[in-house]
């Protein structure tokens, strides 16, 4: 492939593909279990393919990059698991947890459990932003026929994982997901973004005020539109608007102690949503 075509491909990928942490590469398609998995709480380094000189790329490298670009929303991630997931049993009130790496790692990270015995389904994908989540919302939420969906999203948009993003863009995507859910009689739980004072894969963005502002919008939107607001932020933020190391070793991804603090808050929000 001529060098200029490779450069074009790489530029497109850098602009729209997830670039780090989130950036944690998620585990293969498997139904959710309570078995501990390797620690995925810390982001990996940026994939070297994204920064390699075009002339150094082998044909297999180029094919790998093309494949990632072809499935930007990562619809393949849960396709097989969804196909094997049975419809909810009569009386079962399924809940889909929908998000990025913070959701994806819940139950995969060592010493964390994903609500054993509960009819909850995890459909988080590490690194995702709200436009990616909106694209896969039908496949990974609506088609699973849940009673409720718990949406935790937006921090990777602020980090710029899939390119430039404005508050209005994030709000529009969250609003669209909520509207799709309501149109299919799915109760909506909108979670606050977790506190963050810096992104380890993109230093210097000073996101704390942006997180607070977006959370204020999420809270207002939930109140005005019959959704339940799940306030993780207030229970986890330190005085700097970030997360203490006990709750998130890298300042973004919860530790087992962080998930232990989040779990009862999620349960209460689900109870509220399903009681309406």
Question: What residues fall within each predicted segment?
Answer:
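Conserved beta-strand elements of the Class I
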Residues: 96-98, 121
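Alpha-helical protein-protein interaction elements
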Residues: 42, 64, 70, 90, ...
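Catalytic nucleophile serine of serine hydrolases
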Residues: 101-102, 124
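N-terminal secretory targeting modules
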Residues: 1-96, 103, 108, 144, ...
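Alpha-helical cap/lid subdomain in secreted, periplasmic
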Residues: 112-121, 128, 132-276
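Short, functionally important structural connectors and interaction interfaces within domains
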Residues: 8, 67, 77, 94, ...
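Short hydrophobic segments within beta-strands
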Residues: 98-99, 191
């Amino acid at each position: 492939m001529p060098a200029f075509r490779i450069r074009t491909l790489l530029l497109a990928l850098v602009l729209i593909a997830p670039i780090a942490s989130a950036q944690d590469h998620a585990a293969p398609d498997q139904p959710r279990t309570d078995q501990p998995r390797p620690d995925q709480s810390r982001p990996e380094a940026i994939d070297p393919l994204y920064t390699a000189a075009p002339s150094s790329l082998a044909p297999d490298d180029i094919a790998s990059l093309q494949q990632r670009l072809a499935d930007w929303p990562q619809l393949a991630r849960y396709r097989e698991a969804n196909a094997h997931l049975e419809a909810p049993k009569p009386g079962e009130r399924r809940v889909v947890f929908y998000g990025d790496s913070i959701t994806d790692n819940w139950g995969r990270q060592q010493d964390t459990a994903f609500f054993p015995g509960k009819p909850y389904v995890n459909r988080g994908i590490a690194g995702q932003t709200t436009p990616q989540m909106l694209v896969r919302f039908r496949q990974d939420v609506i088609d699973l026929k849940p009673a409720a969906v718990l949406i935790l999203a937006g921090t990777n948009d602020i980090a710029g994982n899939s390119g430039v993003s404005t508050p209005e863009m994030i709000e529009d995507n969250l609003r669209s997901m909520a509207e799709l859910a309501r149109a299919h009689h799915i109760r909506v739980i909108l979670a606050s973004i977790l506190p963050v004072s810096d992104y380890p894969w993109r230093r210097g963005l000073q996101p704390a005020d942006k997180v607070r502002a977006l959370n204020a919008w999420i809270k207002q939107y939930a109140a005005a539109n019959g959704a339940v607001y799940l306030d993780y932020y207030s229970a986890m933020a330190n005085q700097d608007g970030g997360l203490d190391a006990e709750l998130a070793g890298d300042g973004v991804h919860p530790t087992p102690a962080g998930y232990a603090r989040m779990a009862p808050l999620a349960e209460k929000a689900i109870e509220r949503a399903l009681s309406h």
